[in-house]
Regions:
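Hydrophobic, small-residue-rich alpha-helical packing segments that form membrane-like cores
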Residues: 150-219, 225-243, 247-275, 280-282, ...
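Non-catalytic terminal extensions that flank enzyme cores
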Residues: 1-47
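Generic recognition of flexible, low-complexity loop/linker segments
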Residues: 94, 210-214, 273-276, 319, ...
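Active-site His/Glu-centered metal-binding helix of metallohydrolases
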Residues: 62, 66-70, 578
Length: 974
């Protein structure tokens, strides 16, 4: 029976999506008005999404708090946190929920049919029948609440979203993104912050929170998406009978209104906080922003992706080069946001100064006028088109399911015109159209119309203010104290009581009979088979080649791995600088802008990285292998071009362009600073591990705080350091880019191998052959520092680390289960639910390194105390068989991720380089599947060993770190 025979639905459109190997169908549920879209294909990684148009009217963050709260229990699944129960006990390949400026979406994915149905069931129940109406405790936990432990205590505000957004508002990039959006749309929903402004979140009442759900969480306002290889008729019938038929079609006013164009550009100035010791000079962000039509124009939608590449994103692109040459900022970037109804094109200059605003605007507009007059670089346009078309055809979204990313892109048109859901799924004709326009003046006309003549734009200035965080914290504390002083004794007692009741609620465990309602798989549903390993050792042109034979749809993925042994410790940061400059500096035959375009016209791109491997059969020796890797991908007939361009980058790069090197150092410094605010948890964990782990110290010196300190020193003292920098880059390149230093990894089908071997001859004998200096083994010196790094952030990233193998405890597969147990039970309940942090996680690897870390955490000392309690938690670990099965299934879910061809090849090579055999993986899988509670209790020794190391690092607010200064051996400003 076809879906057309289902009487509950009306078929509105069918679409041949052959470029995506799919058939598209748009339906409407007759009774409820729910919109339903199907993408049928043979992809086993099935996706379900339900989304709602949720335009906020203020910055209280109600869409965001709602997204968190509906996943905290529902009618059929009345447990306190079904989301966490699913994470612990399902085979999901994706499970999350996301709040956007105008929509909220709830996607799930799984390859297992039974599991997929379970995920759909829990999510449908969550959005339509959440337990938020039963009491206000979920709202107070996830959103915000006053916290007063005793009548004489300090009144504070807590809440998961509240603390998450405090962290988000600490990042200048986050502030910039919000102010740009708000500045361009003062009269519609984009004028406010859907995630919530921490200053405004406490204005949200419980009743207004419930009103938001009543208004927007109705099938009439819903968008349901099903993707993959499944029985669509069965799913549609279930949706109808189980949920949609319970509702009548109701008009829901959720329309996203277009902003009336401006008659002149607006200017907005906003401050952001920097640490008291930071300089305000060269710390301003300037942004030039224009509104570009609507997302319903599929040609414009892609054309500005191409223009973003050609004008801004590519190294040496004209707008980027002009601003750098003028000295307006040190890191120039572009942004094209086509995920809102009216897309935004931005030119952003970081590390600039307020007084440069006029020059910033003048340089941009003069450069654009010159481009319109003299024509845009045609090769840059072709490179941009090929770059985006290659990615569309390859559909490699990394760890994210393909169907998930297609679904999110559908919303770019479907949300604003329900008759046009597929327009961005049929991109090949649009790419063909754009190729035809390269020589016609089409792109120049777009620049004139949308960037020069268009007055619907803004200039946004985000300028630094020293101590702003401390000032705002004091203002909030004074405000809360004044509020407390205004309360009667009865009102204060009521706050203390409410605080205690929320804590008691958080302490309560869900009833066993409620937990039993969450559908789970059994261990018998899990295969004991491991994923295949595709490694075949060959030799080509005298070099070891590891071939990974998989079907790649005609694309060859190659990596050249150069061994880094023999590089002394003091030169490690220079390896990373070398890795960063190659491909974006001039070579013998190309200026760097033309080099990048040449690569992207013919290939799928070339990139470089530093990787670390260890022989897992010899972990106690603490030896590891570091490699410099250059990776690229191309269609088989273009492999010769790919290797030719790799050779150009490795052997012909010009390190003598001092001006370009200084530009790159400034960009690196800026981006490292950004990463400390956005990914402080990984930075803190790495730094803490580096106190005793040579491998982690190598990583920190090439990608962490140690690296940042060297880059900062070089950039700020460039004139006196430049000769040393250039000499080091040349010497390291000559030392490592050698044929006798090389292993090749290549992923392709069998017929792609011969073409690769033939193409490789172009590079094999041109690598360095001159005699090397005598190599001295690299000795890495670790020093225990236990550091606190002060930033302008309002939240902390708190890391405890240690090596358990050093203390006589062996690795076991059960540690992978422990990661799930800690991250979604002990740490989740204590650090996130009770502590209010946005995230918390743990990790344990085969070489004995382990860590506990929190993310956007309002606490410091309290979190450290929670870490100390983990050993007792494990010693007393006691769950029933059903819960134990859930933890095991959640662990396997993390391991059994579907892989695209590139991932199959890179995983196989990773195992090869780490000396991990199929037998080891099979043993680990068996240890996971056969684990008992006693195995988990035995892991208390692992955590005791980790804590006994007494290694810690915290990145966070000046105030919190100074309050706990006795915790640290060193305190620094980052």
């Amino acid at each position: 029976m076809s879906i057309y025979d289902l009487n509950a639905y009306e078929v509105l459109q069918t679409e041949d999506l052959s470029d995506l190997k799919s058939k598209g169908t748009l339906l409407k549920h007759k009774k409820s008005g729910a919109r339903v879209l199907l993408m049928e294909n043979d992809d086993e990684n099935k996706v379900f999404t339900i989304g709602f148009r949720t335009p906020p009217s203020d910055s209280t963050g109600v869409p965001h708090i709602m997204e968190h709260s509906v996943l905290c229990g529902s009618k059929e699944f009345p447990v306190k946190d079904p989301f966490v129960e699913l994470v612990k006990g399902s085979l999901n390949t994706f499970l999350n929920a996301m709040t956007y400026p105008d929509k909220t979406v709830y996607p799930v994915a799984s390859c297992n049919d039974k599991d997929f149905q379970n995920l759909m069931h829990v999510y449908m129940d969550a959005v339509f029948y959440p337990n938020i109406y039963q009491n206000d405790k979920t709202f107070r936990q996830e959103g915000w609440s006053y916290k007063l432990d005793n009548p004489d205590g300090e009144l504070t505000i807590s809440g998961v979203v509240y603390n998450e957004m405090k962290g988000a508002f600490s990042s200048p990039e986050g502030v910039l993104d919000r102010v740009v959006l708000n500045s361009l749309f003062p009269d519609n929903t984009y004028s406010v912050e859907s995630g919530g402004d921490p200053e405004v979140i406490p204005e949200l009442t419980y009743e207004r929170f419930l009103d938001f759900h009543r208004k927007y969480y109705h099938p009439s306002n819903s968008y349901i998406y099903l993707y993959g290889d499944m029985n669509m008729e069965e799913k549609l019938r279930w949706l109808d009978e189980k949920y949609l038929s319970d509702f009548e079609n109701e008009p829901v006013d959720s329309e996203i209104h277009l902003q009336k164009p401006f008659t002149e550009m607006k200017e907005v100035v906003q401050e952001y906080s920097i640490a008291s010791e930071e300089s305000e000079e060269d710390n301003t962000y300037l942004s030039y922003n224009k509104v570009i039509g609507t997302t319903l124009d599929e040609k414009l939608y892609l054309a500005f992706e191409i223009l973003d590449y050609a004008l801004l994103s590519a190294p040496g692109a004209p707008l980027k080069k002009a601003l750098l040459d003028a000295g307006v900022g040190k890191d120039i970037s572009g942004s094209y946001d086509n995920g809102v109804y009216q897309p935004i094109f931005s030119v952003i200059s970081k590390n600039a100064n307020v007084e440069q605003k006029e020059e910033f605007v003048r340089v941009i507009e003069d450069t654009l006028k010159d481009i319109v007059k003299n024509g845009i670089n045609k090769k840059a346009l072709r490179a941009g088109i090929n770059y985006h078309e290659f990615r569309f055809r390859e559909a490699d979204f990394g760890n994210y399911p393909r169907g998930l990313m297609y679904g999110l892109q559908l919303f770019d048109s479907w949300l604003y015109d329900e008759t046009k859901p597929f327009i961005h799924m049929q991109a090949i004709p649009t790419f063909e159209f754009l190729k035809e326009q390269v020589e016609t003046g089409y792109f120049e006309e777009l620049i004139q119309k949308y960037l020069l003549d268009n007055t619907h734009g803004s200039i946004v200035i985000i300028k630094p203010e020293r101590g702003r965080t401390a000032r705002m914290d004091k203002e909030l504390a004074d405000k809360l104290q004044a509020y407390k002083d205004s309360l009667s004794k009865e009102e204060i007692d009521a706050l203390v009581k409410a605080t205690k009741e929320l804590e008691e609620y958080q302490e309560e465990e869900s009833a066993p009979e409620d937990l039993a309602k969450i559908p789970v798989l059994g261990r018998e549903d899990i295969s004991r088979e491991i994923a295949p390993i595709y490694n075949k050792e060959l030799e080509t042109s005298g070099v070891k080649l590891v071939h990974h034979e998989v079907e790649t749809n005609g694309i060859g993925y190659t990596a050249l791995l150069f061994d880094l042994s023999g590089i002394p410790e003091e030169k490690l940061p220079y390896i990373s600088i070398l890795q960063s400059v190659l491909g974006i500096i001039n070579t013998k035959n190309y200026e760097y802008s033309e080099l990048f375009n040449e690569i992207n016209v013919h290939t799928g791109g070339i990139g470089t990285s530093l990787e670390l491997y260890t022989d897992v059969t010899k972990v106690k020796e603490k030896e590891f292998r570091a490699t410099f890797e250059i990776k690229g991908k191309a269609l088989y007939p273009k492999m010769d071009v790919l290797f030719s361009m790799m050779r150009e980058i490795l052997m012909e790069s010009d390190f003598g362009d001092e001006k370009r090197l200084k530009e790159i150092l400034a960009m690196l410094k800026s981006r490292l600073q950004m990463s400390f605010l956005s990914s402080g948890h990984t930075t803190a964990a790495l730094r803490s591990l580096s106190y005793t782990s040579p491998m982690a110290k190598f990583k920190d010196d090439t990608d962490g705080i140690g690296y940042y300190e060297v880059v900062k020193e070089l950039e700020e003292n460039f004139e006196e350091k430049k000769a040393e920098l250039i000499a080091n880059l040349r010497q390291i390149a000559q030392q490592i880019f050698r044929k006798d230093n090389l292993i090749i990894s290549y992923t392709s089908s069998a017929d792609g191998l011969a073409l690769m071997e033939e193409a490789f001859t172009k590079i094999a004998d041109t690598l360095h052959t001159e005699e090397k200096e005598a190599e001295i083994p690299c000795e890495i010196h670790c020093v225990k520092r236990n550091e606190g790094f002060k930033t302008s952030s309002k939240v902390q990233y708190v890391a405890r680390t240690g090596n358990f193998i050093d203390r006589g405890v062996e690795y076991t597969g059960a540690l992978q289960i422990l990661k799930v147990i800690l991250s979604y039970d002990y740490l989740w309940q204590n650090v996130r639910v009770k502590g209010g942090a946005y995230g918390c996680m743990s990790s344990f690897n085969r070489i004995g390194e382990g860590y506990l870390v929190s993310y956007r955490d309002p606490n410091l000392e309290k979190t450290m105390e929670i870490y100390e309690g983990v050993v007792d938690y494990l010693k007393n670990f006691n769950v029933d068989d059903r819960d134990m099965n859930k933890f095991i299934i959640g662990t396997i879910s993390n391991i059994d991720r579907p892989m695209n061809p590139a991932a199959k090849g890179s995983r196989s090579m990773n195992l090869y380089m780490n000396h991990v055999s199929a037998e080891m993986i099979r043993e680990e899988r068996d240890q996971i599947l056969d684990a008992q509670q006693s195995d988990i209790r035995a892991l208390a020794d692992v955590l005791q060993a980790l804590l006994d190391a007494h290694e810690l690092c915290v990145i966070g607010s000046e105030e919190k770190i100074e309050e706990q200064k006795e915790m640290f051996l060193e305190i620094k400003t980052l």
